[in-house]
Amino acid sequence: MIFATLEHILTHISFSIISIVITIQLIDLLVYQIVGICDSSEKGIIATFFCITGLLITRWIYSRHFPLSDLYESLMFLSWSFSIIHMVPKAGNHKNDLSAITGPSAIFTQGFATSDLLTEMHQSAILVPALQSQWLMMHVSMMLLSYAALLCGALLSVAFLVITFRKNTDIAVKSNYLLIGTFSFGEIQYLNEKRSVLQNTSFPSFRNYHRYRLTQRLDHWSYRVISLGFIFSTIGILSGAVWANEAWGSYWNWDPKETWAFITWTIFAIYLHTRTNQSLQGVNSSIVASIGFLIIWICYFGVNLLGIGLHSYGSFTLTAN
């Protein structure tokens, strides 16, 4: 009873803190450069990390198994993973471009985990025989860490595409205006003078330079985070194959979860391959990563919604009240 109450308290504290963090980030976005507001956001994420860590440890103690046996526990672990990814750039004293991704992702996953849809899973249950293995921690934790990293990397690629295509759209609109517009002599003289000034300087406009630097950072972090997630995914799939052989006598069975895990792994393997080709980097590789974003959600929620296959334990059904 004490552990259940403590878990309930930690759940609401962590959700409240992450909600405040999102609010702070929105204020920082709308009201530029408020002194100390960014530091408060970082401290909030750290506090959330410790709250979720305490929650998972508490559930581990009173359930007597690693808390990764159902969708509720996996969502809480996924939220915990997002908070870790958020803190990685800060530890290296890098500009944290991940904060706009990790914060909302953490609040979304934790909000869904604590919703009424998963009420039946809030109470820990005895593990089914197939899950009573030491491979549970290794396999499931690696897969969830890979989901968190791949989702963050894919969202960074989506942001890269949005900024890039928006820039191209602005250029196209301006080009059409120049082609179809009629100019007076004064307007033509002004454009010629402006072009002359731009040709005589070696620096692009501040706005274009800032946008260029932002897209480069997004592309850079997307590649690094996806590479990390791909490593976790590979380890998770291999450890899962070993566990499957021990539990069911076969390394691979092509059930829905395994099939979509393989598709996810293949998509991001293609992404990493495009990164080795200079001509395919940037937009092309980001498109592949964006496709991977959809594939991950199908892989993660698909089996739980269908409730079929060898990985159907921990699934949930939508029932009317």
Curated annotation (Swiss-Prot):
Membrane topology, record value: Multi-pass membrane protein
Quaternary structure (record): May interact with Ccs1.
Protein name: Cytochrome c biogenesis protein CcsA
Record-annotated membrane-spanning stretches: 17-37, 43-63, 143-163, 225-245, 258-275, 287-307
UniProt keyword list: Chloroplast, Cytochrome c-type biogenesis, Membrane, Plastid, Thylakoid, Transmembrane, Transmembrane helix
Location(s) in or outside the cell: Plastid, Chloroplast thylakoid membrane
Keyword NAD: no
GO cellular component, one term: chloroplast thylakoid membrane
GO biological process, one term: cytochrome complex assembly
UniProt xrefs under InterPro entries: Cyt_c_assembly, Cyt_c_biogenesis_CcsA, Cyt_c_biogenesis_CcsA/CcmC
Molecular function terms, GO-annotated: heme binding
Record-stated family: Belongs to the CcmF/CycK/Ccl1/NrfE/CcsA family.
Superkingdom as given in the UniProt entry: Eukaryota
Role: Required during biogenesis of c-type cytochromes (cytochrome c6 and cytochrome f) at the step of heme attachment.
